[in-house]
């Protein structure tokens, strides 16, 4: 498991405004918790703590959304 910006299968982050949304999305995918990182590298995006390795995180390269 690792911490990171949770991403969909197109390498796009989950855009957010509120922490509860991210906490819920992260936990739904097996993470311990999550929050909305404002004005981060990818704008306002969900950051997950201890996300299982099988769940994609944002990697270098384009968001293909």
Curated annotation (Swiss-Prot):
BP terms from Gene Ontology: defense response
SMART domains hit by this protein: Knot1 (SM00505)
Residue numbers bearing the Arginine amide modification: 64
Keyword Disulfide bond on entry: yes
Cellular component GO terms, alphabetical: extracellular region
Matches recorded under CDD domains: neurotoxins_LC_scorpion
Subcellular location, record wording: Secreted
InterPro entries assigned to the protein according to its UniProt record, in alphabetical order: LCN-type_CS_alpha_beta_dom, Scorpion_toxin-like, Scorpion_toxin-like_sf, Scorpion_toxinL, Scorpion_toxinL/defensin
UniProt key word Transferase: no
A Gene Ontology molecular function term of the record: toxin activity
Chain ranges of the LCN-type CS-alpha/beta domain: 2-64
Family to which this protein belongs: Belongs to the long (4 C-C) scorpion toxin superfamily. Sodium channel inhibitor family. Alpha subfamily.
Domain notes: Has the structural arrangement of an alpha-helix connected to antiparallel beta-sheets by disulfide bonds (CS-alpha/beta).
Protein name, per record: Sodium channel neurotoxin MeuNaTxalpha-9
């Amino acid at each position: 498991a690792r911490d990171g910006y949770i991403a969909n299968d197109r390498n796009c982050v989950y855009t957010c405004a509120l922490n509860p949304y991210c906490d819920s999305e992260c936990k739904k995918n097996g993470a311990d918790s999550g929050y909305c990182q404002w004005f981060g590298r990818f704008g306002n995006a969900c950051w997950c703590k201890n996300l299982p390795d099988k769940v994609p995180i944002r990697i270098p390269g384009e968001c293909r959304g």
